[in-house]
Design a protein with these regions (language model features):
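Auxiliary tRNA-acceptor-end handling modules of aminoacyl-tRNA synthetases
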Residues: 1-157, 161, 173
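Short, flexible turn/loop "capping" segments at secondary-structure junctions
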Residues: 163-166
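Catalytic palm active-site di-aspartate
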Residues: 168-170
Length: 176
C-alpha cells in the first residue's frame, strides 16, 4: 500500500513562524467563514454549490453591479438579458454541447433537450445575427448581468470561488 507524505522546509525558524502566521491569517480571513458570520450569504444542503444571498450580502452585490453598470454605460455598452434555459441546438451549433455538456445542467421537456445557460456567448451571438447590420453599426458592445450555472463536481466546490450557480457581469464586442 502506498502512502503519500508531504513535507515542508524553511531556511530559518523565522520563515517557519511567518508561514504558520500566514496559515492562521488565511483561516481567520476565509470567506467561507466570514460570509455567514457577517450575514452576507449561506450555503445549504438543499442546493449544493448555490449561494443563498442574505439582505446585507445582496445589497453589497447590487452596489457592485450598479457601479459596474455605470462604467459600462459610460463606455457605450448596451445591456441585454437573454434566457437562462436554452435549446441544446444552440450549444450544438456553437460547439459547447460536444465539449462542455458534462458541465451543463440538462433539461428534457416536450421531447426537446435544453440546458441552463453556463455562459452568455452563444446567446449574444444569436442577438447579433438577429438583424442585418452595416459596418457603420459596429462596434456593437453588449453587456449582460445574469444568472449562469455550471455543473461542477461536488469535490471541486469551494465557497464562492467555485460554485454551480452565479451571476456574471459579461460583455461581448462585435467589431469590424
Amino acid at each position: 500500500q502506498l502512502q503519500r507524505v508531504y513535507g515542508t522546509s524553511f531556511e530559518s525558524k523565522k520563515d517557519l513562524e511567518q508561514y504558520l502566521f500566514q496559515l492562521e491569517e488565511a483561516k481567520r480571513r476565509d470567506h467561507r467563514k466570514l460570509g455567514p458570520e457577517l450575514g452576507l450569504y449561506r450555503f445549504e444542503d438543499v442546493a449544493p454549490g448555490f449561494a443563498f444571498w442574505l439582505d446585507k450580502g445582496y445589497r453589497l452585490y447590487r452596489e457592485l453591479e450598479n457601479w459596474s453598470r455605470k462604467l459600462q454605460e459610460a463606455r457605450g455598452y448596451e445591456e441585454v438579458s437573454t434566457p437562462w434555459i436554452v435549446s441544446s441546438k444552440l450549444y450544438e451549433t456553437s460547439g459547447h454541447w460536444q465539449h462542455y455538456r458534462h458541465n451543463m445542467f440538462e433539461i428534457r421537456s416536450e421531447d426537446q433537450d435544453f440546458a441552463t445557460k453556463p455562459m452568455n456567448c452563444p446567446c449574444h451571438c444569436v442577438l447579433y445575427k438577429s438583424q442585418i447590420r452595416s459596418y457603420r453599426d459596429l462596434p456593437l458592445k453588449i453587456a449582460e448581468y445574469g444568472p449562469l450555472s455550471r455543473f461542477e463536481a461536488s469535490g471541486t466546490l469551494h465557497g464562492l470561488l467555485r460554485v454551480r450557480g452565479f451571476h456574471q457581469d459579461d460583455a461581448h464586442l462585435f467589431v469590424r
